């Protein structure tokens, strides 16, 4: 079997995208994710994303991590899937004006030229509304997303901490103790603020926290350093994928954690290894809004095993 695909990334958080509107195929998707993700022996990616017909919206996105596990949500992946779906006509008939919350966020983002269009996309975390900034040539240059309300109840993240909310909670590492805040943005995140970000041994500490017994579904891990009230630097270890260049839901979780800990204001720029994301935690509607790029790298055909 051959499978046509696109390689896309959001700030270096890259995935192989397969369009199941254009190709009516069935495959072992977890195994394909494991095959395409290695950078020496596959296409090279953080995982696999399927763009397919939705049950509750025109388009649905499914995400498989590099290890084959299925994820509920990926912010960078959603932006890329939204761009692909718009530019390939998959959102025709459902495009509309920006709803109130996204319109307010877009006004703050103040992008020059172009026009905004919105559409719903189905994910494992529910239906999310995307805002597409369309420029000359009907091309999407930036994508905003209404990421919804953060989940803060410990049991729903899920964690086994006894506290109702995990905010700046002590957490023991093999060589010391840190303060951790846990947030779900449709997937679970642990955020640790530190003034010594350059000293973090992410390859050692990341998997230790990811697989800790406190997190029954494992967890995404982020170390962050506040550079001011409106800017934060972030390093990410993703559940099922390891170190990545960026994590959209993780950046949203960092913005929320920074607000809960009193370190950050509502509007924040997150500095990630792959670039910058603009975030807004709007306390009026309790939604988190995200803006960032979605980049097409190349298209190809997979000839390997499935």
PLM features per residue range, with description:
Residues 1-24, 145, 157-159, 163-183:
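N-terminal, positively charged, Ser/Thr/Ala/Gly-biased leader segments
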Residues 1-139, 190-306:
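A glycine-rich beta-to-alpha transition motif near the start of alpha/beta enzyme domains, typified by
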Residues 89, 156-158, 172, 262-263:
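Glycine-centered secondary-structure boundary/capping sites
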Residues 138-147:
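Short, solvent-exposed secondary-structure boundary/capping segments
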Residues 151-155:
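Short, charged/polar, Gly/Pro-enriched secondary-structure boundary elements
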């Amino acid at each position: 079997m051959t499978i046509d695909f696109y390689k896309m990334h959001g700030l270096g958080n890259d995935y192989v995208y397969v369009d199941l509107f254009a190709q009516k195929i069935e495959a072992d998707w977890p195994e394909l994710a494991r095959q395409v993700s290695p950078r020496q022996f596959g296409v090279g990616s953080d995982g696999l994303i399927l763009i397919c017909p939705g049950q509750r919206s025109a388009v649905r996105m499914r995400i498989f991590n590099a290890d084959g596990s299925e994820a509920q949500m990926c912010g960078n992946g959603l932006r890329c899937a939204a761009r692909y779906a718009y530019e390939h006509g998959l959102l025709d008939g459902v495009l509309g004006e920006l709803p109130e919350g996204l319109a307010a966020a877009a006004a703050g983002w103040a992008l020059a030229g172009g026009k905004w269009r919105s559409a719903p996309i189905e994910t494992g975390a529910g239906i999310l509304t995307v805002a597409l900034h369309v420029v000359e040539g009907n091309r999407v240059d930036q994508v905003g997303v209404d990421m919804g309300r953060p989940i803060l109840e410990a049991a729903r993240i899920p964690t086994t901490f006894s506290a109702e909310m995990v905010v700046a909670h002590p957490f023991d590492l093999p060589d010391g103790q840190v303060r951790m805040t846990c947030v779900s943005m449709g997937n679970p995140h642990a955020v640790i603020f530190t003034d010594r970000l350059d000293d973090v041994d992410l390859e050692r500490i990341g998997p230790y926290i990811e697989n800790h017994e406190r997190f029954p579904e494992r967890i995404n891990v982020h170390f962050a350093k506040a550079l001011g009230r409106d800017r934060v630097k972030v390093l990410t270890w993703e559940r099922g994928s390891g170190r990545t260049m960026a994590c959209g839901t993780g950046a949203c979780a960092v913005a929320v954690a920074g607000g809960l800990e009193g370190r950050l204001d509502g509007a924040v720029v997150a500095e990630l290894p792959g670039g910058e994301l603009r975030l807004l935690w709007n306390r009026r509607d309790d939604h988190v809004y995200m803006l960032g790029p979605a980049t097409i790298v190349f298209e190809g055909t997979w000839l390997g095993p499935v």
